[in-house]
UniProtKB/Swiss-Prot annotation:
Protein name: Putative uncharacterized protein DDB_G0281041
Ranges of Low complexity composition bias in the record: 14-33
Top-rank taxon, per record: Eukaryota
Region span, Disordered: 14-53
Length: 53
């Protein structure tokens, strides 16, 4: 009984935590792409500049 209840708690909690991780990852990817475009626009040497991503 105790083991079954623990499995139920884990099953209930895991989807929400996975969704939270996915949301964080997608947000960080959006921030990274925005920063890339800003750096390339501000870099006078373009893609041949010293800072590459």
């Amino acid at each position: 009984m105790i083991f079954n209840s623990l499995i139920n708690i884990i099953n209930k909690s895991s989807p929400s935590s996975l969704n939270n991780n996915n949301n964080i990852n997608s947000k960080s990817l959006q921030i990274n792409s925005e920063n890339k475009s800003k750096i390339q626009n501000n870099n006078p040497l373009g893609n041949k500049g010293g800072v590459q991503f």
